[in-house]
């Protein structure tokens, strides 16, 4: 096994084939992450990430003159990317499950897409604010109907509705 620092330096100087040697060095780690994931394209995702990682690698730092620091840096970066991709994949799977449930209920795709986007937008609000916004915008209920359903005043519903919209406005800006 050649010096990892030298391989990265050569790759950055234009020896493109060095990236294959670097990928071969980390192939067991990529395979491990692939086995530990439900996502079938995990190895490809991490390999592409490694290309970007090596391209932007900070070789000028003195601590990266030794292989042990480079290996640790790449390992931690790959692990963080693995976690990020897994979370994203689980979120997509969750949405797909919701899509299947909604399709069973004969919902159209445009409505489904807007519902998924709506849920993603309101994720940072309180449960009460989410509930009121869902009833107003997804179910088409008026504030007076919501107030009767929740046994609170119409003014309380209106105040919560406006507060939620203000929070969303701040989040967007």
Curated annotation (Swiss-Prot):
InterPro entries recorded: RNA_pol_sigma-70_dom, RNA_pol_sigma70_r4, RNA_pol_sigma_r3/r4-like
Annotated region described as Sigma-70 factor domain-4, given as residue ranges: 122-169
Sorted UniProt keywords: DNA-binding, Sigma factor, Transcription, Transcription regulation
Domain of life: Bacteria
Any one GO molecular-function label of the UniProt entry: sigma factor activity
DNA-binding region(s), residue ranges: 143-162
Biological processes, Gene Ontology terms: DNA-templated transcription initiation
UniProt entry tagged with the keyword Transcription regulation: yes
Family designation: Belongs to the sigma-70 factor family.
Function: Sigma factors are initiation factors that promote the attachment of RNA polymerase to specific initiation sites and are then released. Transcriptional regulator specifically required to activate expression of the toxin gene locus, composed of tcsL and tcdE/utxA.
Protein name: RNA polymerase sigma factor TcsR
Origin species: Paraclostridium sordellii (Clostridium sordellii)
Gene designation: tcsR
């Amino acid at each position: 096994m050649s010096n990892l620092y030298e391989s990265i330096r050569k790759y950055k100087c234009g020896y493109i084939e060095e990236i294959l040697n670097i990928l071969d060095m980390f192939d067991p780690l990529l395979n491990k992450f692939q086995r530990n994931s439900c996502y079938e394209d995990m190895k490809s995702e991490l390999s592409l990430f490694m290309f970007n990682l090596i391209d932007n690698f900070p070789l000028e730092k003195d601590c990266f003159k030794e292989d042990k620091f480079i290996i640790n840096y790449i390992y931690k970066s790959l692990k963080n990317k693995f976690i990020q991709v897994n979370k994203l994949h689980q979120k997509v799977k969750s949405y797909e499950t919701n899509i299947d449930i909604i399709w069973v209920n004969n919902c159209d795709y445009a409505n489904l897409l807007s519902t998924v986007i709506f849920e993603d937008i309101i994720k940072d609000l309180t449960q009460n604010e989410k509930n009121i916004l869902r009833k107003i915008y997804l179910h088409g209920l008026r504030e007076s109907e919501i107030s009767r359903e929740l046994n609170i005043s119409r003014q309380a519903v209106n105040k919560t509705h406006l507060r939620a919209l203000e929070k969303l406005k701040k989040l967007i800006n």
